[in-house]
Amino acid sequence: MIKKIDGTIVDLLFAPLSAGEVIFSISLAAVTRSVVIGIVSIVVFYLIIDIEIKNYLTLIAFTLLSSFVLGCIGIIAGLWAEKFDHMATVTNFVIVPLYFLSGTFYSIERLPDILQAVSKANPFFYMIDGFRYSFIGTSDGSISFGLVYLTALSFVSWFVCYLLYKKGYKIKS
């Protein structure tokens, strides 16, 4: 988004890189940023409270998959948006509702069956459930299904980013 506004998107468009390489690089930059922030957060919280990680492998897997999916969502939003208000629209009407309906603040077992089914279609549910399982050892859903679901969503979201960037959606005149 910022590259579109300040005109530096041209540097990416004229770089001797394929669309796949550019999108993969930007996605991995999002993952790197997320991992660094996560590590710093865990270290700071560890100094304040006693944090026990029950499953390191699950934590790593869900961190990488969640940050990759969210990075791709950010790329899609950045390609679609023409101004910062459009980015706020994505945050306010897509990200925040999915987050609040993900079972972060409550167990989805307390919801009626229909809302449980809706929650289990929400990718944020599996992201948060994976982190919950990593730290406290309990989950509301299937961790293995969550890994498969987020892996598939990673491929799909990356492919959508790839197609939009390759087409030049809202970046090439």
Question: What does each model-found stretch correspond to?
Answer:
Residues 19-91, 138-162:
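Alpha-helical transmembrane segments and their short interhelical loops
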Residues 8-9, 27, 39, 72, ...:
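Hydrophobic alpha-helical segments typical of transmembrane helices
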Residues 1-17, 171:
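Transmembrane helix boundary and interhelical loop/hinge segments in multi-pass membrane proteins
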Residues 49, 99-156:
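Membrane-interfacial helix-loop-helix junctions in multi-pass membrane proteins
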Residues 165-173:
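Short cytosolic juxtamembrane segments of multi-pass membrane proteins
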Residues 18-19, 107:
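Short coil/turn motifs that cap or connect alpha-helices
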